[in-house]
Amino acid sequence: MNSKNTIVYVKVPGRQREGFVDPPPFEWNQHQDRKLWAHISTIEDKDDIDWQLLSNQTNAPEFFIRKRVYQLFRVHLKSIEQEIYSHTSADRAPNRSSQAGDEPAASVGVLNGYGQNINDIHDLSSLQTPPTCRGKANKDEDGGNSSGISELSSLSVSKSALEEALMDRLQL
């Protein structure tokens, strides 16, 4: 018995609702789960699902089949989301070395809110980085050689422009 995938129904004595029928006992296992997913994943439209037929084929109540199908879709969509996230985070890794036989990385091809293509990884990462963290990211990119001013400033002013302003202020 596994507490993560076991549902326990407790029958409490008391007034029974009119027309209530106890659900029939049934057994569910991984083999039936795989068989159900193999059938459901090939269907083009949710209206094409014959819930009664699935219920009869698996010897499980229709309410359970519906709930299980929704759970299977949720799990598979989450795994796809994680796979996409891992691929995009691997593309953003700055220390990735390319070998001679590697093909060049494909462009990101993401549309921004104005329908313009964002092909540069740096542009995409700047959109995904919150404005409060951008100064810290710039410090990390130059190997920690920044003067620390960029962390305190929320303005996007280059380090050389700040140095020029400081030199002008000190009249050097």
From Swiss-Prot:
Residues 87-158 are annotated as: Disordered. Its main location: other. Keywords: Autophagy, Protein transport, Transport. Residues 114-131 have a biased composition (Polar residues). It comes from the Eukaryota. GO terms for molecular function: SNARE binding. GO terms for cellular component: Atg1/ULK1 kinase complex; phagophore assembly site. It is found in: Preautophagosomal structure. InterPro entries: ATG29 (IPR039113), Atg29_N (IPR040666), ATG29_sf (IPR039362). GO terms for biological process: autophagy of mitochondrion; cellular response to nitrogen starvation; piecemeal microautophagy of the nucleus; protein localization to phagophore assembly site; protein transport. Residues 147-158 have a biased composition (Low complexity). Plays a role in autophagy. Functions at the preautophagosomal structure (PAS) in order to form normal autophagosomes under starvation conditions. Also plays a role in mitophagy and regulation of filamentous growth. Belongs to the ATG29 family. PANTHER family: AUTOPHAGY-RELATED PROTEIN 29. This is Autophagy-related protein 29. It comes from Eremothecium gossypii (strain ATCC 10895 / CBS 109.51 / FGSC 9923 / NRRL Y-1056) (Yeast). The lineage of its organism: Eukaryota, Fungi, Dikarya, Ascomycota, Saccharomycotina.
